[in-house]
Regions:
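Auxiliary, metal-adjacent structural segments of Zn-dependent hydrolase domains
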Residues: 26-84, 88-92
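Catalytic Zn2+-binding segment of zinc metalloproteases
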Residues: 104-121
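Solvent-exposed loop/turn segments at secondary-structure junctions
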Residues: 89-91, 114, 180
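Bacterial N-terminal signal peptides that target proteins for export
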Residues: 2-13
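Acidic/His-rich structured neighborhood in mature extracellular/periplasmic domains
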Residues: 69-70, 95-97, 111-112, 122
């Protein structure tokens, strides 16, 4: 990754964020799900709105005792447009928020390539498609989030066994999971209900 002085790196980060939020990173041409969440909404309200938006997008939300493999609290299946949340999350609201935000990033990635197919597009690819950033700048955008959270090395180690495209999608989800308001905005901007 290209190491830039902090202020310059911050400018690239802010510019990338602005492009993601503006929809310039490649939103499908459908009608909007709804307006951005109110500024003073509680996190529970934001999560409930996100779940409502998923329903409007025809993304099935299932609550089950187990989702995926052992110790997995949630999964998003892009081929089926199906989100599974472990019922264990009901007892742990903060963890529920974190896990749901992580999975919502995967929904946004799926929206970037169209919910009607079984593929997704990484947010990084969406930024690259704008032509405004180099690969190094795009990588720095998400690594900045992970660095600021102090979990960069853990996430890199956890995702190292994945194929590169899957790894990129997971890095993005881990990077943005601690910013539920941003994830909500990405969902509203890039995931549209067909007219």
């Amino acid at each position: 990754m290209l190491r830039l002085p902090g202020s310059v790196e911050g400018l690239f980060w802010a510019a990338g964020l602005a492009l993601l939020l503006s929809g310039a990173a490649g939103a499908a041409s459908h009608d909007a799900v709804g307006a951005p969440a109110a500024l003073h909404a509680t996190q529970d309200d934001l999560l409930d709105r996100a779940l409502d938006k998923l329903q409007a997008l025809s993304v099935a939300v299932l609550e089950r005792p187990h989702c995926g493999g052992p110790r997995q609290l949630a999964t998003y299946n892009m081929g089926l447009n199906q989100l599974c949340l472990s019922s264990e999350l009901r007892r742990q609201p903060r963890l529920r928020e974190l896990v749901l935000s992580h999975e919502l990033v995967h929904v946004v990635q799926d929206c970037l390539d169209g919910l009607d197919n079984s593929t997704s597009l990484s947010l990084a690819q969406g930024l690259r498609n704008t032509g405004a950033f180099t690969d190094q700048q795009v990588a720095g955008f998400f690594l900045q989030y992970l660095r600021s959270q102090g979990n960069l090395q853990h996430v890199l180690a956890t995702t190292s066994v994945l194929p590169q495209d899957s790894r990129q999608r997971e890095l993005e989800a881990y990077a943005l999971q601690y910013d539920p308001a941003l994830v909500q905005r990405l969902l509203a901007t890039h995931c549209k209900v067909k007219s």
